[in-house]
From Swiss-Prot:
Protein name in UniProt: UvrABC system protein C
Coiled-coil region(s): none
UniProt keyword annotation of Ligase present: no
Span of domain UVR: 219-254
Protein purpose: The UvrABC repair system catalyzes the recognition and processing of DNA lesions. UvrC both incises the 5' and 3' sides of the lesion. The N-terminal half is responsible for the 3' incision and the C-terminal half is responsible for the 5' incision.
Subunit structure, interactors included: Interacts with UvrB in an incision complex.
Keyword tags: Cytoplasm, DNA damage, DNA excision, DNA repair, Excision nuclease, SOS response
């Protein structure tokens, strides 16, 4: 019996001319144990990743069924190699399966894009805790509330807490160095603990009430505030009673405006609804945290029809012996919706927060999936298929949201594909698959020659590809020389492409857009000729009169006459979209680089100030401006700064 984790050798590249894959011999060697299997084609590319409670039974089902759908039969015909990994349990198989799906993106699996982590609202561990937006790994040091479906949902909750409880949002360095209240105190959004305008005890109570509100204990918080108001009134402290009364009024307004879960029910709930149309799908995830509906987020899977057909085979093969099953049409929308929902739950929650309750639009049949989620969460996870009351209303909202998001997505895809086609025709690119049109666009950004940066943004598959964007720090040029900057970035980018071509792994775009006119295009042409690349790929985007959108001119490096497309051109709309994204990406990087240089460079120039001392100074005085405003005596109070060094710092900065 193979031990857990045992796996077959990696997939070799198989010559298609060799004998067909001997499935029978391979299946005979498989164990009847839980595990994960991978199918590979003759080129070694992964076709499908699946899990099984019985590897032998599952894999053999693909090769013994006589009524396979055309899509499954097509995949099976491509199988040239199988790898398997034995695990200890079905839960382990589920986890490994979804990790492999995310890593390998197989052609026949339903895939959801691995989104960045969800945002949280954080209350810091401080004598006067700070309320902050947070995205990333959580720890036990601070309090985290969420996750939230979007940054907007976090900031909306922060605005509510600022209005009702007036918690601070400033950085600790700012808090430690304030001598008078900020504007937020004047507009009644902060109680100014920085200048002791509120006692530590009262501020702690406000923090506790805010946390209770976020955790869904709205009635308890309301009662606490009412008791506090009555105590102030009984003590004839009418001004304080009026302040608490205003808090109660603001909180009542919030609770009236938002749908709140009934008392006694779980206050953290996710609502999942699936919509399908024309081979496309949307999963709409609505989040309820602390009994409050925070909004929703739409997810759009790929490989929908191929993946759903094969998932159906997997589910049927995994039914225990003796259990009755009803055959379903491979393209049945209800079955596809269930398969898509199960794929989303598996891929989404196995590394995310799992709420106690999932309200779903379709049943979840996958054996062991909910058990695995419960084991991960360390508590019971309930799945509600036919909710009542507020949950029913939330599910109906989520279902409508899924339908609207899918309709909008299909409409956007149609218009974006039309723009891609128009650009290809305008520039003269001949492609059978428009999704393969790869466009790279370059822009240079600086302020009077300072902090020069170049950006490269990428467009393909009818969309901007943020994960492939690159920034380049431009060095060793005359400040403000945009031509030299463009030469440097193009040489650095496409020298790498030339080197990759020698290894048969080029990543060459079909169009290279340059934000500039004839001068910039001429520089690009020289670089491409030096590297032996096709200058026909180069297109400059020259700004029109008054820099108005729609008046741009396309400038070609290969001698073709310049082209003015006009404001109504679909091709120009796409060019402008890509060019503007390159400009945005470059300018944000340039600003960050410039700010960093201005905040640290003057301290770096002072002898005796290393990284640690510089960090202590900036933290103590809240930035370079605070350091410059400090006296010699104040500078000398910082750890590691002697009286002599403090005098030198003061002299250098003044």
């Amino acid at each position: 019996m193979p031990p857990p984790g045992a796996q077959t050798p990696p997939a070799p590249a198989v010559d298609p001319s060799e004998a067909a894959f001997d499935a029978k011999a391979h299946i005979a060697r498989l164990p009847s144990l839980p595990g994960v299997y991978r199918y590979f084609d003759a080129q070694g590319s992964v076709l499908y990743v699946g899990k099984a409670r019985d590897l032998k039974k599952r894999v053999s089902s693909y090769f013994t069924k006589t009524l396979l759908s055309p899509r499954i039969a097509m995949m099976v015909a491509k199988i040239a190699h199988i790898e398997t990994t034995v695990v200890r349990s079905e839960a382990e198989a589920l986890l490994l399966e979804n990790n492999l799906i995310k890593a390998l993106a197989p052609r026949y699996n339903i895939l959801f894009r691995d989104d960045k982590s969800y945002p949280y609202l954080k209350l810091t561990q401080h004598a006067y805790p700070r309320m902050a937006y947070y995205r990333g790994a959580t720890d036990r040091k601070h309090q985290y509330f969420g996750p939230f479906p979007s940054a907007h949902a976090v900031r909306e909750s922060m605005q509510i807490l600022q209005k009702v409880f007036q918690l601070r949002t400033c950085e600790d360095t700012v808090f430690n160095n304030r001598t008078r209240p900020c504007l937020l105190h004047q507009i009644h959004r902060c109680t100014a603990p920085c200048v002791q305008a509120i006692s530590a005890e009262d501020y702690a109570r406000d923090v506790a009430n805010a946390a209770g509100f976020l955790l869904g204990r709205q009635d308890e918080v309301m009662q606490t505030l009412q008791d506090k108001m009555q105590r102030h009134a009984a003590a004839l402290e009418f001004e304080q009673a009026a302040t608490v009364r205003d808090q109660i009024g603001a909180l009542s307004t919030v609770l009236t405006r938002q749908s709140v879960e009934e008392v006694g029910q779980a206050s953290d709930i996710d609502i999942l609804a699936v919509a399908i149309k024309g081979g496309h799908a949307c999963v709409n995830l609505a989040m309820v945290r602390g009994g409050r509906h925070l909004g929703d987020k739409a997810y759009f899977p790929t490989h929908v029809e191929e993946g759903a057909a094969i998932v159906g085979v997997d589910v049927e093969a995994d039914v225990p012996e003796g259990a009755e099953t009803q055959p379903e049409p491979a393209r049945d929308p209800e079955r596809m919706a269930r398969d898509i929902l199960e794929a989303f739950v598996a891929q989404h929650y196995l590394d995310q927060f799992v709420p106690p309750v999932l309200v779903v639009s379709h049943p979840i049949r996958a054996a062991g999936l909910i058990e695995a989620l419960a084991a991960q969460a360390g508590r019971r996870v309930s799945v509600v298929r036919q909710p009542q009351g507020a949950r029913r209303a939330w599910l109906e909202m989520a279902e409508k949201g899924a339908e609207l998001s899918l309709a909008r997505r299909l409409s956007e895809q149609g218009s974006q594909q039309a723009r891609t086609r128009a650009l290809a025709e305008t520039i003269g690119v001949d492609l059978e698959d428009l999704a393969a049109l790869r466009v790279e666009c370059f822009d240079i950004s600086h302020t009077a020659g300072e902090a020069t940066q170049a950006s490269c943004v990428v467009f393909h598959s009818h969309a901007m590809q943020n994960g492939e964007y690159r920034r380049y720090n431009i060095q060793d040029i005359i400040p403000g020389d945009d031509y030299a900057a463009m030469r440097q970035v193009l040489t650095r980018r496409y020298q790498k492409v030339v080197e990759q071509a020698a290894e048969d792994a080029p990543d060459m775009p079909r169009v290279v857009l340059i934000d500039g006119g004839k001068g910039q295009v001429e520089v690009a042409r020289q670089v491409f000729e030096e590297l032996g690349l096709d200058i026909g790929l180069l297109v400059g985007v020259a700004k029109g009169e008054g820099r108005k959108v729609g008046l741009e001119t396309l400038v070609f490096a290969d001698g073709r006459p310049s082209l003015e497309l006009g404001q109504g051109s679909a091709a120009l709309m796409l060019v402008a979209q890509i060019r503007d994204e390159a400009h945005r990406f470059a300018i944000t990087g340039m600003r960050a680089k410039r700010a960093k240089a201005r905040n640290t460079s003057r301290l770096e120039e002072i002898e005796g100030i290393g990284a640690k001392r510089r960090q202590r100074l900036l933290a103590r005085f809240g930035g370079l401006r605070g350091v410059m405003a400090a006296s010699v005596e104040e500078l000398a109070t910082v750890e590691g700064i002697s009286q002599t060094l403090a005098e030198e710092i003061y002299r250098q900065l003044h």
